[in-house]
């Protein structure tokens, strides 16, 4: 008989741990090319080891037809994640996606060890099936108190200014 080993992660050294899932879904050939373009750029950015990024996992396949791919990241704390999102190259990707969606939908879901969960879905009404939290929870516009991830997580402090204004 094979002995089974059972472990768990000791997260006591990570009191502010953040886990974020990110994904894009192509709705057109142009969207497929956008997916192919962003992959190497993300790999280059995470290989630069941004401060606070503990681990990056890619190649989560939600579907092949239509292409819907994602990744998961572990961050030391929300401030580190927020700082990275307000700098290049992430800031440029976000501005570009908001200005020119290029036939893709994007979503992310953020989970805090302290208990908060937040999400944002761009062009989610174009999804054939509603991903993640939208599969069971109603959607609301990301405005006002729901505009930034910091606000959606109900974290204290001003944080960094958003990449785009409301």
What are these regions (language model features)?
Residues 1-68, 83, 106-166:
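Short S/T/G/P-rich N-terminal loop/turn motif that feeds into the first structured element of a domain
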Residues 74-75:
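Tryptophan-centric aromatic hotspots in well-structured domains and transmembrane helices
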Residues 78-108:
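An amphipathic, aromatic/His-enriched active-site/gating alpha helix that lines ligand/cofactor pockets
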């Amino acid at each position: 008989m094979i002995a089974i080993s059972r472990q768990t992660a000791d997260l006591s050294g990570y009191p502010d741990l953040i886990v974020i899932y990110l994904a894009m879904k192509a709705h057109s050939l142009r969207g497929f090319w956008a997916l192919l373009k962003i992959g190497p750029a993300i790999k280059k950015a995470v290989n630069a080891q941004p401060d606070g990024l503990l681990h990056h996992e890619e190649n989560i396949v939600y579907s092949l037809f239509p292409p819907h791919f994602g990744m998961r990241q572990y961050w030391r704390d929300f401030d580190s994640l927020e700082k990275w999102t307000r700098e290049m190259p992430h800031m440029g990707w976000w501005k570009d996606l908001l200005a020119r969606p290029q036939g893709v939908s994007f979503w992310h879901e953020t989970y805090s060890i302290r208990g908060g969960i937040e999400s944002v879905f761009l062009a989610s009404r174009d999804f054939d099936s509603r991903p993640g939290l939208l599969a069971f929870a109603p959607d609301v516009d990301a405005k006002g108190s729901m505009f930034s991830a910091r606000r959606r997580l109900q974290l204290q402090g001003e944080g960094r200014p958003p990449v785009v204004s409301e």
